[in-house]
Design a protein with these regions (language model features):
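Rossmann-like flavin
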Residues: 104-216
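A conserved FAD-binding loop/helix module that cradles the flavin
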Residues: 68, 493-516
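A glycine-rich dinucleotide-binding beta-alpha-beta segment and adjacent secondary-structure elements
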Residues: 195-210, 374-380, 433-498
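Active-site-proximal substrate-binding core of FAD-dependent oxidoreductases
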Residues: 270, 518-542
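Mid-domain catalytic core of redox enzymes
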Residues: 266-392
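N-terminal glycine-rich phosphate/pyrophosphate-binding loop and immediately adjacent elements
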Residues: 14-151
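Helical element adjacent to the flavin cofactor pocket in flavoenzyme catalytic cores
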Residues: 225-279
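Flavin-binding catalytic cores
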Residues: 127, 338-339, 372-375, 413-454
Length: 542
């Protein structure tokens, strides 16, 4: 492929150090960090608003999050914390009670309280001894929290952070933590607790990912989300999730980055095995001195933005087996009163997991994996006005539920209708008479989610499955477990690459870090070697 040619309207080629394609939260993190280093950075976003899947819509007095809503990992992430977003208007809101789990026609439920002692007391009432086991788990979390989160969000392999983790735990305890990372969540619960309450909290939190509860890795995810919830709650940006994206944009612009919305990338130009620039959707051509970072899906980068001649056959074949996470269906409801939950634990909870106990979750997940529409859904629920009263008029509730459809039926209208009806029946069983308070609704099908954000293919809000076979070295395809591509100076900085889905900024941080390292004179040989290794790998037959 030949390099960029031609001129812009001013009679000259626009040249910058780096172009970031896509202003999702990862792209904005990349832009801020590159601009901090003195780079001239241009961010282009085809939507009219920045944020990608970190977005809200405002309709009168109602503020509704379009995609993600509650972000414990964002609050705990060292990447986002180090950006100082509180200086750019970000404020976190918390519900009185972070979480409750209601299984079936549960009249009581189990709550995760803000104070771990209160959580432990509830668990102990359900099964004596579980309270002490809970506090032991919390104590271990507090010891490993910082090195573990850094290890999960840093480049692969996380040698330095793993060493700090071992030093924190000791050689006797570290192997047990490594084993726990491989456990299915139901086995993790069985080994630590005698009652159902803690098991439901762990398994419900594991369902924030698409890892089946019987699969390796679901234990780690359930434990991580549960301990984060016990540590920082399930917070949401005050005024809507869009406020997080707004703060990231302001932070990037304060560092000197330029952010343009309403204009996307049409083509990434490569010549001689190295990125040269980007042709924009409005006809402009932008040459880059150093890098292009794509905050896009891997498919968008390799199948649309790059010329087919610039994509090795081995990479195309590997990408064809990329697995998306389960399609998401989201039901947004406006109620003129609080939800009439029968379970006291549900009142005042910001997030709820509703519909099944642990055996029920195993059956629900198996139905989805078998390609069937579950007869009885499991849903994640957000009471956003309970978390943040500014989301709706006083005395009302902005409520959402989301659940999943089988992978191969995201556009099936009958499956969507049946699942919406199932969610309505589930809500009626737990909060009789809720529908009498409904004053508005907004259903987001998998197709709607993808239409609003092209990275969410088929309604896959995680940017690809989070199961172990597609993490680290295998995300998005077999490689080196990082943002580098087979093209020099071209980086993938989205949830499609390690460390994967979630609002944490790690993918954008790693892309910026790699670009900065490869641009320094002492880092260039290593960068060229890694790019060459990827080119060799993808030229081989998978």
């Amino acid at each position: 492929m030949i390099g960029l040619t031609g001129q812009d309207e001013g009679g000259r080629m626009q040249t910058v150090d780096a172009v970031v394609v896509g202003a999702g939260h990862h792209g904005l993190v990349t832009a801020a960090l590159l601009a901090d280093a003195g780079w001239d950075v241009l961010v282009v976003e085809e939507r009219d608003e920045v944020g990608g899947a970190v977005a809200s819509r405002v309709d009168g007095d109602w503020v509704e999050d379009e995609f993600s809503a509650c972000h414990p990992l964002a609050l705990a992430s060292p990447v986002l914390r180090d950006l100082g977003l509180e200086h750019h208007g970000l404020e976190w809101a918390h519900a009185p009670r972070p979480l409750a789990h209601l299984a079936g026609r549960d009249r009581d439920g189990i709550a995760l309280h803000a104070d771990p002692l209160d959580t432990a007391a509830d668990l102990d009432r359900g099964h004596p001894g579980d309270g002490a086991a809970w506090l032991e788990m919390v104590e271990q979390w507090q010891r490993v929290r910082e090195p573990l989160i850094r290890a999960l969000l840093t480049r692969w392999p996380p040698v330095a952070d793993a060493a700090r983790l071992v030093a924190r735990l000791g050689l006797r305890e570290a192997p047990d933590l490594a084993r726990m990372a491989l456990l299915p969540v139901h086995q993790l619960a069985r080994e630590h607790f005698g009652g159902d309450g803690a098991a439901q909290l762990l398994a419900g939190n594991a369902m924030h990912a698409d890892i089946p509860p019987t699969a390796p890795g679901s234990g780690l995810y359930g434990w991580l989300m549960t301990m984060l919830c016990q540590d920082v709650g399930f917070p949401s940006p005050r005024g809507g999730t869009q406020q997080l994206a707004r703060a990231l944009r302001l932070r990037a612009e304060a560092a000197g980055a330029r952010v343009e919305t309403g204009v996307g990338a049409g083509r990434v130009v490569v010549a001689g095995g190295r990125v040269h620039g980007v042709e924009l959707s409005d006809g402009r051509r932008v040459r880059v001195r150093r890098a292009v970072v794509a905050d896009t899906s891997a498919q968008r980068l390799y199948e649309d933005l790059l010329d087919p001649a610039d994509v090795p056959a081995g990479l195309r074949r590997r990408l064809a087996r990329f697995a998306w996470d389960l399609p998401t269906l989201k039901l947004n409801l406006r109620l003129d009163a609080p939800v009439p939950w029968t379970a006291p634990q549900a009142r005042g909870a910001g997030v709820l997991h509703v519909g099944h106990d642990v055996p029920g979750l195993i059956r629900w997940s198996a139905e989805l994996e078998a390609g069937e529409v579950p007869g009885a859904p499991f849903a994640l629920v957000g009471q956003m006005s309970t978390i943040d009263p500014s989301r709706s008029p006083e005395g009302t509730e902005a409520l959402w539920l989301y659940t999943h459809l089988p992978r191969h039926r995201p556009a099936d209208a009958a499956a969507v209708a049946a699942t919406v009806e199932g969610c309505e029946r589930l809500l009626e069983s737990l909060a009789p008479g809720w529908s009498q308070h409904e004053v508005g609704r907004w259903v987001q099908t998998p197709g709607d989610l993808e239409g609003a954000d092209a990275n969410l293919v088929g309604g896959a809000v995680g940017g690809g499955t989070q199961q172990l076979f597609q993490q680290a070295l295998w995300r998005p395809v077999t490689g080196l477990g990082g943002p580098r591509t087979h093209v020099g100076g071209l980086y993938l900085g989205s949830a499609a690459t390690h460390p994967g889905g979630g609002v944490h900024g790690g993918c954008g941080h790693l892309a910026a870090r790699a670009a900065l390292q490869d641009a320094r004179w002492w880092g260039r040989p290593r960068g060229r070697a890694l790019t060459g290794a990827l080119r060799w790998l993808h030229d081989e037959q998978p």
